[in-house]
Design a protein with these regions (language model features):
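Sec-dependent, cleavable N-terminal signal peptides
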Residues: 1-19
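A composition-driven surface/loop motif
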Residues: 16-285
Length: 285
């Protein structure tokens, strides 16, 4: 009888372990019994659900408010987790970390995410890569923003075609292994680089605190009242009032006009160089 009971307990424990997907929300594990609707978890509103087949956690117009000393969202061992944002989403935690990742995670759009923390990090990723793509994330933290947790080359942050606006008193993007920017750039402040000395985004060796903005690069030039960006720089003739060949090379800082006409509307400047040092305007024809 004792052996039967022991085997029964072991079987139940094994089943529970197999059903646990390695994701925790406000201290509650995500598993097969609740994954289709996680809005029943205390502190969660809106639509939150998990698909174990694709390892996709979807937040749709959702708010996760931290409860006590619990992290709002914790990926402990779901390797390759994708967090899909739909609509406007919020994570608020006054006591603990907003989001913590100990397995490789991707946060992706098309929606937005607003993270607010008071005492701890907004996003913490430890010894693993973190990817942010095709979305908008706004962070406001009385402590730190995006943090690698431990200084490790494995903690690489990739930001792809996204806007990440970090406001953090004690450091915006700090203590991580490196950064990869694709179809976006550090827009503000100027002069920010990844500093291997402090393993953080810094200016002249000083960690950036306050505000740091990653977004679509703006070349500080406008043509017929329209900002020149990475999206439109190869063909500026699509701008109203512009004809012929007008294009901009962000690497050489060269604006080329070839048999072009720029006829902006009333009170609009044809070409305005707001802050592009060493701009060259190449006129052909």
């Amino acid at each position: 009888m004792a052996l039967v009971v022991l085997l029964a307990v072991f079987t139940v424990a094994t089943m529970q372990a197999a059903a646990d997907y390695g994701i925790v929300i406000n201290g509650y594990s995500v598993w097969e019994k609740n994954c289709n609707d996680l809005s029943g978890i205390k502190g969660v509103t809106g639509s939150v659900k998990y698909d174990p087949a694709t390892k996709t956690l979807t937040l749709e117009n959702a708010t996760i408010t931290g409860i006590g000393k619990e992290r709002c969202l914790f990926n402990s061992e779901c390797e390759g987790l994708r967090i899909v944002l739909k609509g406007s989403n919020r994570i608020v935690n006054n006591e603990e970390v907003g989001m913590e990742f100990r397995s490789a995670t991707t946060i992706c759009g098309p929606g937005t995410l607003d993270i607010r923390t008071n005492k701890k990090e907004a996003i913490l990723f430890i010894y693993v890569p973190l990817t942010i793509e095709d979305c908008e994330i706004t962070i406001n933290s009385e402590n730190t923003g995006i943090v690698g947790g431990f200084i490790s080359e494995k903690s690489v942050l990739t930001v792809r075609n996204s806007r990440v606006d970090v406001n953090a008193k004690n450091g915006c993007v700090v203590y991580f292994g490196g950064i990869v920017l694709e179809d976006c750039a550090i827009v503000q402040p100027k002069g920010v680089v990844f500093d291997k000395g402090c393993m953080s985004l810094a200016i002249d060796g000083e960690i950036v605190k306050g505000r740091l903005l990653i977004g679509k690069p703006n070349y500080a030039i406008s043509v017929a009242g329209v900002a020149v960006t990475k999206d439109n720089c190869n063909d500026l003739s699509v701008i109203d009032g512009v004809s012929g060949i007008v294009k901009y090379d962000g690497i050489t800082r060269t604006l080329t006009l070839e048999n072009a006409t720029i006829a902006p509307g009333k009170s609009t400047v044809g070409i305005f160089n707001a802050d592009c040092n060493d701009l060259t305007i190449n006129v052909i024809g």
